[in-house]
């Protein structure tokens, strides 16, 4: 009886974590688009997100609800290059959402396997992709090309940011894995270092982009009031959901299998598209949406083909656990914290 009740409670907890992760992941890109639409200061917006995550991790750590590595300058110096790459990925992502719709963001986010496959073959001397993997990459590329060709809101500025985002997020995916392997930090330690260092980097970009002059001009024009009601609510939601996806992402990854986590991530993309279409008119044309779905489906095929391509080897239990931990950190840290889907 008690065993049955325990299993029931565990299942309920797991379901709650998965639902929480799905809601945060599917809503975050749309919420960020709302935030940047009503609060057109990408540098300040991301700084508020970093501040929220940093303070939340610190307070939860002080209360004993989570455990994170202490902040030390020696570790910070080692982690700084990864934090810069992380900041650039979030910076380009926010500016992409500033100039383009959510669908364009998802298309370019889905193109990352193509760049990773090319980089692995050219720079790391990895073998050419299998037929199934190659076919999946072709589907991704075809969907992306079709989307761009039918995008009625195409602008050079938006697609310049899209290309910059594609390069930085691909670099981050590779580089964060390298940093995780060489700097021993737990999950919440990574969250703390990523966001605190990014918060320190933010003022540099405020001055380089000239955004600080826009903020001061808006403050003087609005008598010190920078937030309108819509802006305040969307920015607050963006900050809260940015932190929640860190928590639910890590917790859900621990509670379910890697395959189930991947499937959940794919479903989240479809939910994002549906939500974006339902709430307003800032989305792609019907033909563009079909091309977007092709790109997402190609990404699903790529993920499955890569799993099939992996050789089955006998490894020790210790090595297996370490590999799973590194894979978990690699999947969850890049592109998830504070701002992106």
Curated annotation (Swiss-Prot):
GO terms for molecular function: antiporter activity; GDP-fucose transmembrane transporter activity. The chain crosses the membrane at residues 17-37, 41-61, 71-91, 103-123, 132-152, 156-176, 187-207, 231-251, 260-280, 283-303. InterPro entries: Sugar_P_trans_dom, TPT_transporter. Pfam families: TPT. Keywords: Antiport, Golgi apparatus, Membrane, Sugar transport, Transmembrane, Transmembrane helix, Transport. It is found in: Golgi apparatus membrane. One of its GO terms (biological process) is nucleotide-sugar transmembrane transport. PANTHER family: SOLUTE CARRIER FAMILY 35. This is GDP-fucose transporter 1. The gene is GFT1.
């Amino acid at each position: 009886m008690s065993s049955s009740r325990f299993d029931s409670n565990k299942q309920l907890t797991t379901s709650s974590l998965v639902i929480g992760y799905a809601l945060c992941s599917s809503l975050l890109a749309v919420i960020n688009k709302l935030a940047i639409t009503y609060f057109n200061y990408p540098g300040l917006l991301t700084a508020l997100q970093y501040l929220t995550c940093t303070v939340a991790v610190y307070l939860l750590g002080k209360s004993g609800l989570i455990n994170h590595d202490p902040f030390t300058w020696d570790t910070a110096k080692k982690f700084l290059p990864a934090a810069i790459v992380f900041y650039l990925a979030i910076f380009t992502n926010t500016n992409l959402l500033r100039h383009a719709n959510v669908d364009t963001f998802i298309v370019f986010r889905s193109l990352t396997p193509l760049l990773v496959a090319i980089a692995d073959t050219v720079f790391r001397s990895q073998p050419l992709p299998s037929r199934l993997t190659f076919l999946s990459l072709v589907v991704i590329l075809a969907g992306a090309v079709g989307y761009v060709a039918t995008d009625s809101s195409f602008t050079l500025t938006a697609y310049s940011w899209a290309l910059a985002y594609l390069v930085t997020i691909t670099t981050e995916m590779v580089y964060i894995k390298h940093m995780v392997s060489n700097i021993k930090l737990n999950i919440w330690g990574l969250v703390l270092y990523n966001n605190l260092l990014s918060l320190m980097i933010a003022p540099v970009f405020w001055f380089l982009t000239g955004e600080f002059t826009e903020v001061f001009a808006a403050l003087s024009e609005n008598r010190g009031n920078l937030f309108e009601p819509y802006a305040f609510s969307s920015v607050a939601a963006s900050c809260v959901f940015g932190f929640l996806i860190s928590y639910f992402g890590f917790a859900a990854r621990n509670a379910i299998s890697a395959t189930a986590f991947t499937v959940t991530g794919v479903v989240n993309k479809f939910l994002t598209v549906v939500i974006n279409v339902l709430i307003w008119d800032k989305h792609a044309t019907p033909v563009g949406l079909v091309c977007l779905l092709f790109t997402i489906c190609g990404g699903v095929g790529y993920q499955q083909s890569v799993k099939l391509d992996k050789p089955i080897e006998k490894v020790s239990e210790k090595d297996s656990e370490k590999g799973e931990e590194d894979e978990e950190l690699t999947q969850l840290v890049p592109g998830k914290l504070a701002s992106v889907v």
